[in-house]
Structures are given as C-alpha cells and as structure tokens.
Amino acid sequence: VSDVDYIVESDTPLPTMPNRNPGDIDIKIAEHIFPYLRDGMTLQLGIGGMPNALGSLIAQSDLKDLGMHTELMSDGYLELYKAGKITNKKKTLHRGKGVFSICMGSEELYDFLHQNESILSAPMSYVNNPTVMAELDNFISINSCISMDLYGQICSESSGTRQISGTGGQLDFVTGAYSAA
C-alpha cells in the first residue's frame, strides 16, 4: 500500500444500470448475426438492445466454451455465464479468465464478480489495445450502431446534430478483431 496516497472506505451501494430490452429490429439483427458464431470464440458484445438480444440467443443455444474479452461487462455476460456458455477454456490469452475493463449492471452482476477468480479486471489501456486483441484466436467484436449509410459506414455516437454517446472502444475492438487470428 506504499504507492497509494489515499484510501476512502464507503458503504454506499454501487450504482446499477437497468438492462435494455431489445426491440424487434434488435432481435432481427441478432438473428442475422447468430449463424456466424462458433464454439470456442472469444466475444466482445457492445452495449444496447442488439447485443442483449444476441446474448439471449447465445444463452439459449448449443454454443459452448465461449470466451469474454470486453471493455464493458454487463448483465448480458452474466446471463451467458449462468447458462454455462462462457468458460474461457479455449482462449489463447488469459485462458480460463474472462477479461473486462469496466462494469455496469445489476447487484447480482456485482455479487458474481466479487472475489471471482475466473474474472480479470484490467486497465482499459490493456483491454482496449488492438495489439492485445490480435493475440486472441477466434475473437469477434459485435457492436450496435445508431445509423448506417448505403456504403456500410456506421455512426455509433450521434444522430444528426444530437449527441447520443461518447467515443468508446468500438474502433479499438473492430481493429483488434480484424487483426485477430
């Protein structure tokens, strides 16, 4: 503890984030993505209705031995762990451990993470590093977007002049997944 300047103890509960229920379009998109998934893949699922819909499809499927390497761990991953889909057994980096940088979800998710040795919380500079992701065999990054043009270019931050979200790790994960074996 010699490198710590201050320690502040608190018994204030962690903030929770409600799980966004997918809409009909989210479900349709997830159904189009699902056939491309294979046993043993390492997943990064973004945030929103479509990744939640895909997580539900995976939880009810025959897929097995999936891995987790993600910026944001949410209740969608908890559902996959509870269904026995994520084992991290086939990962080529941090085998046996799901890796994440930040977490937001339910109290149940926080309880699951508490002293869970099969989960590794790492700095964002590591988790979001495309060079690190490139070391993961069968790594796939699945994110949602707000809009797409006819060329397939996506926008995941704004709609017209209305800002919806900030720049997250989506580009890092797309680059990392593209570089992965």
Where are these regions (language model features)?
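Conserved phosphate- and dinucleotide-binding cores of soluble alpha/beta proteins
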Residues: 1-181
